């Protein structure tokens, strides 16, 4: 089993890196404001039709454009969900959503979280899925990538105020990156058996003689961007465990590759844009090493089985509860780590059925800020915050002014870094405390003891860090949970973007200092170790007490 796990992980990473490298070069051209070959004329027509002036923006103007863009998208999606019952492409005549569920869902998809307090096949019309949720999957992904474009330019430029044009970046990312990749992946899914139609649900009779409805819909098109944009919201309630979303072992592999493809490519693009490819590789190494460690722990925990059953003498050498037999325990464990490392939230197994330690690792990956590959864009700008924090810590130890890529990290930057890093832990810990203190919060707990607490902690962690996966034993389809998690998703997304853009605005105006003999190397093994240590230290200090009350207490109670 260990050899199989090693081969699965090694082959996955090899294929990922082979695909990500050329895509990184393409992304670097976009960051450098170079139109892709043959598309410059098309872009000029688009700017004219849309009334876009392709002039570069300062950080505040860029930020306001991003915020306005997402606010309008959220309002449009909220209205669509409320009016769903009177709109077309609704063959099952599904009613509009309640205001609190519509608000939760709109915030969820605008913030790239895709938390779902509903079952898609019994709640959403085809119009809501296509025009509402799928469109926001593209736009929320483009938002995250646009923000990291601006931050990367801030490191590459000097003595300037401009960071690019938000409308140009959003358009290019959507039309020339996300749409082509999604089309290719969707066509592959259709070939593998994923539905793509507008038919009404099909009645059929089971082998036992029972009558059921077979859900249909435009699944493949939504499935592709759900993964490539690290969105994660499933067309069906079972998400990628459903055979219509993820029918074969081959689609499962492609789904895992799609989740990490753009985050990995952005690391390569970062190195090219700042004219030092070693910097991008160092960040990628740090992410990969943490990822490998987490995969090993989850595979080990799940292949050991349930400790309580083992002590009773039952045959429980593998924990297959909540997993699809067509994927097996290793691929399910790998998928769980990928989806929580990458802020995706799609699942091909039920995380609530993992062992205590096996479920703790995905939770912890979210709690450290979704910086191990992370969401498209958000993962890299989140890791760059930790890079600057690590540089600052190293500067304190040797008594030198901290610098990264020739840019001095001053008091202003450190305040913004601290604010951005502390936003999500504050939301997670206070949100969990509020849920545990109130009757409305505890009413959603279907399990007592440490596991019930873990379900609450996981839900708030997932929302605040814009992941969207869940320990499904929590009844979150209530006004209390809809509003609490909507607040966490909204603040967890945009209260991080705001300081990141402020940092970009400060850095782009600074001069790039030439390297001196005393300059800290930020591309070697020593710095990679320092960066990993910084990420682990912040995660450990912040969440170990909460984890001790949940998954750790559950694990030791079973021994």
From Swiss-Prot:
Keywords: Cell inner membrane, Cell membrane, Ion transport, Membrane, Potassium, Potassium transport, Transmembrane, Transmembrane helix, Transport. The keyword Chaperone does not apply. The keyword Transmembrane helix applies. InterPro entries: KdpA. GO terms for molecular function: P-type potassium transmembrane transporter activity; potassium ion binding. GO terms for cellular component: plasma membrane. The chain crosses the membrane at residues 5-25, 63-83, 131-151, 173-193, 254-274, 282-302, 327-347, 356-376, 379-399, 416-436, 483-503, 525-545. It is found in: Cell inner membrane. It is a multi-pass membrane protein. It comes from the Bacteria. HAMAP family: KdpA (MF_00275). Part of the high-affinity ATP-driven potassium transport (or Kdp) system, which catalyzes the hydrolysis of ATP coupled with the electrogenic transport of potassium into the cytoplasm. This subunit binds the periplasmic potassium ions and delivers the ions to the membrane domain of KdpB through an intramembrane tunnel. Belongs to the KdpA family. The system is composed of three essential subunits: KdpA, KdpB and KdpC. This is Potassium-transporting ATPase potassium-binding subunit.
């Amino acid at each position: 089993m260990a050899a199989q796990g090693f081969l699965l992980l090694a082959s996955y990473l090899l294929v990922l890196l082979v695909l990500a490298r050329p895509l990184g070069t393409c992304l670097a051209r976009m960051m450098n404001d170079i139109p892709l070959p043959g598309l410059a004329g098309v872009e000029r027509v688009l700017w004219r039709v849309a009334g876009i002036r392709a002039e570069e923006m300062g950080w505040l103007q860029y930020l306001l454009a991003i915020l306005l863009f997402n606010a309008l998208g959220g309002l449009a999606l909220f209205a669509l969900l409320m009016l769903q019952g009177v709109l077309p492409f609704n063959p099952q005549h599904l009613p509009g959503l309640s205001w609190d569920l519509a608000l939760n869902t709109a915030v969820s998809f605008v913030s790239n979280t895709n938390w779902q307090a509903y079952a898609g096949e019994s709640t959403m019309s085809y119009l809501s899925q296509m025009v509402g949720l799928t469109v926001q999957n593209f736009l929320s992904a483009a938002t995250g990538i646009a923000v990291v474009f601006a931050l990367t330019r801030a490191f590459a430029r000097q003595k300037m105020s401009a960071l690019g044009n938000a409308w140009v970046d959003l358009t290019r990312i959507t039309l020339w990156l996300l749409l082509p990749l999604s089309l290719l992946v969707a066509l592959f899914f259709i070939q593998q058996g994923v539905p793509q139609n507008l038919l009404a649900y099909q009645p059929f009779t089971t082998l036992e003689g029972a009558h059921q409805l077979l859900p249909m819909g435009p699944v493949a098109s939504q499935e592709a961007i759900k993964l490539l944009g690290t969105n994660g919201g499933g067309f069906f309630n079972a998400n990628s465990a459903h055979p219509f979303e993820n029918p074969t072992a081959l689609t499962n592999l492609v789904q895992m590759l799609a989740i990490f493809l753009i985050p990995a490519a952005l690391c390569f693009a970062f190195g090219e844009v700042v004219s030092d490819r070693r910097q991008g590789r160092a960040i990628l190494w740090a992410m990969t090493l943490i990822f490998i460690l987490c995969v090993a722990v989850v595979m080990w925990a799940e292949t050991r089985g349930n400790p309580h059953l083992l002590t009773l003498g039952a045959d429980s050498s593998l924990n297959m509860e909540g997993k699809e037999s067509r994927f097996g325990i290793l691929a399910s464990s790998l998928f769980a780590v990928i989806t929580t490392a990458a802020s995706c939230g799609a699942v091909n197994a039920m995380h609530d059925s993992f062992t205590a330690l096996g479920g703790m690792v995905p939770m912890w990956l979210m709690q450290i800020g979704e910086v191990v590959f992370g969401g498209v864009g958000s993962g890299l700008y989140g890791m760059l915050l930790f890079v600057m924090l690590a540089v600052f810590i190293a500067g304190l130890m040797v008594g030198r002014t901290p610098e990264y890529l020739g840019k001095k990290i001053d008091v202003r930057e450190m305040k913004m870094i601290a604010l951005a890093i502390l936003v999500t832990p504050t939301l997670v810990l206070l949100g969990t405390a509020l849920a545990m203190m109130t009757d409305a919060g505890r009413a959603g707990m279907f399990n007592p003891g440490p596991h019930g607490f873990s379900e609450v902690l996981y839900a708030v962690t997932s929302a605040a860090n814009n992941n969207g996966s869940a320990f499904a034993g929590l009844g979150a389809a209530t006004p209390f949970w809809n509003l609490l998690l909507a607040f966490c998703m909204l603040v967890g997304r945009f209260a991080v973007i705001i300081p990141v853009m402020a940092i970009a605005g400060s850095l782009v105006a600074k001069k790039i200092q030439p390297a001196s003999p005393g300059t800290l190397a930020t591309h070697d093994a020593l710095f990679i170790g320092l960066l990993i240590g910084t990420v682990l230290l912040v995660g450990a200090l912040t969440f170990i007490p909460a984890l001790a009350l949940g998954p750790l207490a559950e694990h030791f109670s079973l021994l």
